[in-house]
């Protein structure tokens, strides 16, 4: 070989430059004794309240999300532990006692949800007050979802199943907003309505229905296993709640999601499969014994 040159210099193989993937911190896992056995449960935040809903079918552990729905979580916890006054439906008197103890899951729909917290056990009744929703339409992306797709079909999130649904959920609120009150006034503005329908987003149509959003919050979609407030329309929360048995996209933006089941999922499944009558009421009562913070 020539002086000064190494014969057949072997270059090290080129090292590909790998950008390390961002490390997602592992979610905290805790050991909890539920239904007589130890369960390892993963939670979002070690500081979030954990509550046990103890029922005649067994116990469920829920993690609540105060950063996402502060007033809703506070209402639920204080009603549950008896530190919040409510109106007793039987006497009309203001009382303080653990609100949920002894109430039933009055509505169970297999593959959808279980609902409880009605003080009469009939699905009606409130704690004697109502409070506002805590939902961010922007964090849920409702302002980016159009009401109609390019084919003119309604967005599945609207839960429109018929022409009648479309009338009630989309057209009526839109006509009201535009001050269209007769067939004549509609005919005069049909092009305007058509144009609006093409650009209208889900947040806007829900606002026309009376929903009000707090876009400083960070909300979650109602996926399987969340606990959310039941209501009778915008800002009509009281004591009733439901726990989902499946993803329920069509409830997005209409119900405050304030927690998620973390343990005792088998108990939720058992309650969800309870035989019911035609009104979706369990044939045998599933009763809430207590709702209390997990001792840890």
What are these model-predicted stretches?
Residues 2-296:
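Cross-family detector of peptidyl-prolyl cis-trans isomerase
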């Amino acid at each position: 070989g020539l002086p000064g040159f190494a014969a057949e210099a072997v270059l090290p193989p080129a090292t590909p430059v790998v950008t390390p993937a961002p490390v997602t911190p592992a979610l905290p896992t805790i050991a909890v004794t539920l239904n007589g056995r130890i369960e390892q449960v993963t939670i979002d935040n070690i500081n979030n309240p954990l509550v046990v809903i103890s029922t005649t079918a067994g116990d469920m552990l829920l993690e609540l999300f105060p950063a996402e729905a502060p007033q809703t979580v506070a209402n639920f916890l204080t009603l549950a532990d008896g530190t919040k006054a409510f109106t007793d439906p039987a006497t009309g008197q203001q009382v303080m006692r653990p609100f949920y103890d002894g109430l039933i899951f009055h509505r169970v729909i297999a593959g959808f949800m279980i609902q409880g917290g009605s003080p009469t056990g009939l699905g009606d009744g409130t704690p004697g007050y109502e409070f506002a929703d805590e939902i961010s339409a922007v964090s849920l992306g409702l302002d980016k979802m159009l009401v109609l797709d390019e084919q003119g079909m309604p967005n599945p999130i609207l839960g429109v199943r018929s022409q009648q649904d479309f009338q009630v959920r989309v057209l009526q609120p839109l006509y009201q907003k535009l001050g269209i009150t007769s067939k004549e006034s509609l005919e005069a503005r049909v092009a305007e309505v058509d144009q609006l329908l093409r650009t209208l987003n889900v947040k806007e149509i829900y606002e026309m229905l009376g929903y009000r959003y707090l876009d400083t919050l960070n909300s979650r979609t109602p996926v399987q296993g969340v606990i959310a407030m039941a209501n009778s329309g915008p800002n009509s929360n009281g004591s009733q709640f439901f726990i989902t048995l499946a993803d329920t996209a069509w409830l997005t933006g209409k119900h405050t999601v304030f927690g998620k089941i973390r343990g005792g999922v088998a108990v939720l499944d058992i309650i969800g499969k309870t035989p019911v009558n035609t009104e979706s009421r369990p044939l045998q009562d599933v009763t809430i014994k207590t709702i209390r913070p997990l001792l840890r």
